[in-house]
């Protein structure tokens, strides 16, 4: 990738997700499109364009893929979720601007559990919302603040094999963990540059062992933790050379 609007080029790519075939989907935010690549990085297809119609976007952000390889996209500027098949054909959408149940304000990260329920970081409302696969509202939790279960601009979401929900709480410089019903389990992190500290944690991903990978835009690095938040390792520094980062965002495993 490089900066631009051609196939395989990006302007502010945000999140990525990987389907059952190993293909990589990227939300190319400022080009208002989704791009798809094979495991070797070869361009396969794209869809989108600026607008508010079906299949159009205003700053696509979070991505999630269900067990049928349908693609869920948080359409941040349109305050909605859109769903597509693997080829980019529009299937459905839900959401409207507001703070009521099922309404959204700047939706960001997405996570999908084993039952197909969709978890959304409703960033502007400082909460998480949960929907069934058809977009019907199920539950919500969170409010503005820095206490347990409160948020200051929740960013990315990831769900482990037990259904626990991990959220990067960007403005509070921490990660919070909840069960599937929204009950607070644990949190870790504070503002700083040491091991286990964060400056604006962004992307989250969980591997098959339950280890948690967190990208930080402020420290230009990736940190890895065990499921209980114990620091394991890190890599990255600011730059454009191989292995260096500049405002790292989404991750995929």
Please describe what each predicted stretch is.
Residues 1-253:
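Eukaryotic scaffold repeat domains enriched in small/polar residues
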């Amino acid at each position: 990738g490089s900066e631009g609007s051609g196939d395989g080029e990006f302007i502010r790519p945000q999140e990525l997700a990987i389907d059952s075939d190993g293909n990589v989907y990227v939300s190319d935010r400022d080009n208002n499109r989704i791009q798809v690549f094979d495991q070797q990085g070869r361009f396969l297809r794209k869809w989108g364009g600026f607008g508010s119609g079906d299949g159009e976007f205003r700053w696509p952000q979070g991505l999630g893929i269900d067990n049928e390889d349908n693609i869920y996209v948080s359409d941040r500027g349109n305050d909605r979720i859109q769903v597509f098949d693997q080829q980019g054909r529009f299937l459905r959408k839900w959401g409207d601007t507001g703070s009521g149940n099922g309404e959204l304000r700047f939706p960001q990260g997405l996570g999908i559990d084993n039952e197909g329920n969709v978890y959304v970081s409703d960033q502007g409302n400082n909460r998480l919302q949960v929907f069934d696969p058809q977009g019907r509202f199920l539950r919500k939790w969170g409010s503005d603040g820095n206490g347990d279960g409160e948020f200051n601009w929740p960013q990315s979401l990831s769900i482990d094999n037990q259904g626990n929900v991990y959220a990067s709480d960007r403005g509070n410089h921490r990660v919070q963990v909840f069960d599937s019903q929204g009950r607070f389990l644990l949190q870790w992190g504070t503002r700083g540059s040491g091991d286990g500290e964060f400056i604006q944690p962004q992307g989250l991903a969980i591997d098959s062992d339950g280890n948690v990978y967190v990208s930080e835009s402020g420290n230009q690095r990736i940190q890895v933790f065990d499921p209980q938040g114990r620091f394991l390792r890190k890599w990255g520094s600011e730059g454009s050379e191989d292995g260096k980062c500049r405002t790292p965002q989404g991750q995929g495993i």
